[in-house]
Amino acid sequence: MPSILIVEDHKIVAEVLANILRRSGQYEVASVVHTAEEALERLSNQDVDLVLVDISLPYTTGIELVAMIRQKYPSIPSLVISGHNTSLYVNRSLKAGARGYIVKDDIHDIVTGIQHVLDGDIYLSNQLNKIKFDKP
């Protein structure tokens, strides 16, 4: 069963994400952390198949974390979750190395998004079909 590291600074949102993944029966929640620093520490000593990253983290942004993961752990894909549905954030996330972007309004789409990314595809929330962005 693929294991997912959740990086989300809002504890209630992190709990909702973890519950969605657990209830799907398709994924194991390896850990839930609240900062980029905690995420990098977990990645150094825990095997995960995907990192689910909130774009707005304290101290180090989710986009910066995605770039760090891409550099240090290139075989582990990142999927960004965000309240922002603008091309600016999508483009920055994809350029940093994210393999997908999900708008928090589409949070229940997370299971589908994770599967697409684990299958090697790029996944974008349905809301993003209405905006223009640079494809990686």
Predicted features and spans:
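Active-site residues of response regulator receiver
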Residues: 54, 82
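Acidic catalytic/metal-coordinating carboxylates
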Residues: 35, 61-64
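Conserved acidic carboxylate
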Residues: 8
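Short amphipathic alpha-helix used as the core "switch/output" element in two-component signaling
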Residues: 63-75
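Acidic, metal-coordinating helix/loop segments flanking the phosphotransfer/catalytic sites
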Residues: 32-50
